């Protein structure tokens, strides 16, 4: 946030301002003449802060009730205008705010929906010494109580680096420090946010909306469209796949009937929003693609022509979007359309405007870095194309918002900071001309509070020293343990760049030999001892100990995942996993299965049954053994104890088929490798059987998959791909079948306890 002193009233900065003394005050707070919901919330914060700091209830008055009292003026009022010689916000930009003292009076004001709120927050933090580095889920803001409050004169004027900010989850802390998007009534209620938590835009739905407006099946879509089932009545509204078939995955934006129906439904939605609106905020309508289907929207001839016309895979979509927004601009100027620049096969690549066509300025493009290597910045060659496309978008429109990502799925449980990437990419986004940056961060423990704090500080001022924000956070959050906490944070930050495999956004499982190899046995052991010392230093300070152990949580989860290796290398230290588990506590339900599986593997013991005798003829260093992972997002068991299994446990096959199929696939080259189909005569139920899959050739992104109905049980093998070396192996798979479908009794189930690869040196 760019700040400077007002030199025009620098002569007023002499002498302390006594706000309260001996439980009394001579000050009144002057409310805005026409307070909004946000202003009422801001006033409440100001009153609470002054009460916590001084113990005094400051009286609140309106302009007509002001006499000659000393005063704190919040926002624009007749009193503030008279005192300051005119409307104080007239010269400000949107969201710019000023906090200043003039003689003994104080003025807190800003422009736009949240301007006054930002003025109050600045005053509480910088003049009253409020300490608050995390959201209220962890800790309430704190003031050092005083009997006499005298503050130095001040004058600050600030404007955020980014106009719009958003994290993956809302909170009072995030809202007060700049989270100003996607705060619908439902979200605010669901997160327990108070009255006065309001978005800049009225944006009822955020993302992945095309099927809300054109639902393929009855029961989907907005409430007023749930009786529609467009795929049955109008299959031509949906994209054509490469085989020439219409499929309900995306829309066919070149189709005139689709365009007409989609526009009608969008305008109906706008009408319904207006009917229920209680304010004058602009309306934001999201229109973008469905998430699961990652290929081109449509392969029909008309869409292909528009793809060439705009030199973008989504040419037909942009052609429709430009027509829609051109009409809206003339008929409903307060309506914005928000779309996403998402995936290179879809909308990430900006269109080339044909001769005479201009990209409308009522379109917001949320540019998503979903395909980046997320532990590397846009300065890295592997992510350079993402930044190049961002700059292309910024040349088309000033309304580009960058959507940056953290980790998903099981990866979210691991110690991972990614602060340098966040800081560098935010600065590069600002330099490219982005209007906003949002971070999809989830409310887990570990590094989340730190990341949200640094993100919000950088959103205020991208040029600020992000490392100093880390230090400030640690001092506030970890007290006497701050120095060691900061040391741990920097070591994780450095180590996380050294994984053996590039780190993607989604990690259904944690590969300690690949992207998460930086969580080595030695690193985990060293870091656990750091936390022992932090807890010793925090003895008697329950607040600090709580925060230290919240930071420790992700390390404890990683410790569970590597327990056998840790207990073997450090037997005197890692003696009882239940002590570690007891510290972890609550885990997000969607990721609790990972922790459950790891505990089961600990209980299985450090078992390793020998290979069959037929493998004795191979050199030991040419044989690799693995266990696949079931990454399905359901409540079914992913791992089961089995005393006869190679390692004492086995992975369940998600949604197994019959005949049972499994095989090898090169994901990066989209090439199917060897496969096997097992019929009843090939299966002996209730015992382990080894099947020779055949020869496979590894690539950087490849897998062995199970069940043609799912593939969600698989073994990713890109981590052992070696450039400039032989990557040919012979693969064997150990399976156990049970249940009626496979010739046994009871519920049908397929287990895999071991995949064996033998390196083939023959070319």
Regions found by a protein language model. Name each.
Residues 41-45, 49, 90-322, 329, ...:
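Feature activates predominantly on carbohydrate-active enzymes
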Residues 338-370, 413-418, 445-452:
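Substrate-binding cleft/loops of secretory-pathway carbohydrate-active enzymes
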Residues 683-729, 757:
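Short, surface-exposed tryptophan/glycine-enriched loops
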Residues 706-713, 734-746:
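Short beta-strand-plus-loop segments that form exposed binding edges in beta-rich domains
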């Amino acid at each position: 946030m760019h700040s400077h002193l007002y030199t025009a009233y620098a002569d007023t900065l002499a002498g302390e301002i006594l706000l309260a003394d001996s439980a009394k005050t001579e000050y009144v707070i002057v409310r805005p003449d026409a307070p909004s919901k946000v202003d009422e919330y801001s006033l409440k914060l100001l009153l609470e802060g002054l009460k916590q700091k001084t113990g005094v209830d400051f009286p609140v008055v309106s302009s007509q009730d002001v006499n000659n009292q000393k005063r704190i003026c919040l926002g624009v009022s007749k009193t503030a205008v008279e005192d300051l010689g005119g409307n104080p916000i007239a010269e400000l930009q949107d969201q710019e705010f000023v906090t200043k003292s003039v003689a003994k009076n104080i003025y807190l004001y800003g422009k736009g929906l949240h301007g006054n709120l930002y003025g109050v927050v600045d005053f509480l933090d910088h003049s009253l010494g409020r300490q608050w580095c995390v959201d209220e889920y962890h800790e309430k803001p704190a003031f050092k109580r005083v009997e006499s409050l005298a503050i130095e004169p001040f004058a600050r004027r600030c404007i955020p680096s980014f106009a719009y900010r958003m994290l993956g989850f809302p909170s009072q802390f995030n809202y007060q420090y700049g989270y100003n998007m996607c705060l619908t009534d439902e979200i605010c209620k669901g997160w327990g946010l108070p009255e006065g938590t309001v978005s800049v835009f009225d944006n009822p739905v955020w993302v992945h909306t095309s099927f809300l407006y054109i639902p393929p099946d009855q029961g989907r879509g907005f409430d007023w469209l749930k009786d529609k089932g467009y795929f049955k009545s109008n299959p031509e509204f949906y994209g054509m796949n490469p085989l020439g078939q219409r499929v309900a995955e995306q829309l066919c934006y070149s189709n005139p009937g689709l365009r007409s129906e989609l526009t009608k439904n969008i305008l109906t939605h706008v009408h319904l929003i207006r009917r229920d609106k209680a304010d004058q905020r602009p309306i934001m309508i999201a229109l973008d693609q469905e998430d699961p289907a990652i290929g081109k929207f449509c392969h029909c001839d008309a869409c292909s022509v528009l793809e060439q016309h705009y030199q973008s895979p989504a040419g037909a979509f942009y052609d429709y979007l430009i027509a829609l927004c051109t009409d809206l601009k003339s008929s409903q100027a307060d309506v914005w359309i928000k779309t996403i620049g998402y995936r290179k096969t879809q909308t990430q690549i900006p269109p080339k405007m044909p001769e005479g066509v201009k990209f409308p300025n009522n379109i917001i493009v949320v540019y998503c870095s979903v395909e980046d290597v997320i532990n590397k910045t846009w300065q890295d060659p592997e992510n350079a194309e993402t930044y190049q496309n961002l700059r292309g978008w910024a040349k088309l429109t000033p309304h580009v918002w960058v959507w940056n990502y953290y980790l998903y799925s099981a990866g979210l449980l691991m110690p991972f900071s990614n602060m340098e990437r966040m800081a560098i990419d935010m600065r590069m986004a600002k330099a490219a001309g982005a209007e906003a940056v949002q971070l999809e961060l989830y409310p887990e423990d570990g590094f989340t509070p730190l990341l949200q704090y640094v993100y919000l500080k950088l959103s205020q001022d991208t040029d600020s020293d992000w490392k100093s924000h880390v230090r400030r956070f640690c001092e506030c959050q970890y007290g006497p343990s701050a120095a060691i906490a900061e040391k741990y944070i920097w070591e994780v930050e450095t180590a996380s760049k050294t994984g053996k495999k590039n780190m993607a956004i989604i990690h259904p499982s944690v590969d300690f030999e690949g992207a998460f190899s930086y969580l080595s046995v030695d690193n985990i052991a060293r870091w656990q001892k750091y936390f022992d010392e932090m807890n010793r230093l925090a003895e008697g300070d329950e607040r600090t100990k709580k925060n230290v152990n919240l930071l420790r949580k992700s390390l404890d989860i990683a410790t569970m995942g590597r327990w056998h290796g840790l207990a073997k290398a450090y037997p005197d230290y890692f003696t009882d996993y239940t002590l570690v588990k007891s510290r972890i506590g609550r885990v997000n339900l969607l990721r609790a299965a990972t922790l459950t599986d790891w505990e089961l593997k600990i209980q299985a013991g450090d078992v390793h049954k020998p290979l069959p005798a037929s493998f004795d003829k191979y050199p030991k260093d040419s044989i690799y053994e693995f266990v696949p992972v079931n990454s399905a997002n359901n409540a079914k068991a992913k791992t089961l104890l089995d005393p006869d299994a190679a390692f004492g446990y086995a992975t369940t096959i998600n949604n197994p088929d019959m005949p049972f199929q499994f095989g090898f696939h090169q994901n990066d080259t989209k090439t199917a490798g060897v496969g096997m189909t097992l019929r009843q005569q090939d299966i002996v139920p209730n015992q382990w059987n080894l099947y020779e899959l055949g020869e496979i050739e590894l690539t950087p992104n490849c897998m062995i998959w199970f069940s043609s109905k799912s593939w969600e049980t698989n073994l990713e093998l890109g981590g052992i791909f070696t450039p400039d070396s032989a990557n040919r192996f012979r693969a064997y798979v150990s399976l156990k079948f049970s249940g009626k479908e496979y010739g046994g009794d009871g519920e049908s189930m397929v287990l895999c306890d071991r995949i064996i690869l033998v390196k083939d040196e023959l070319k």
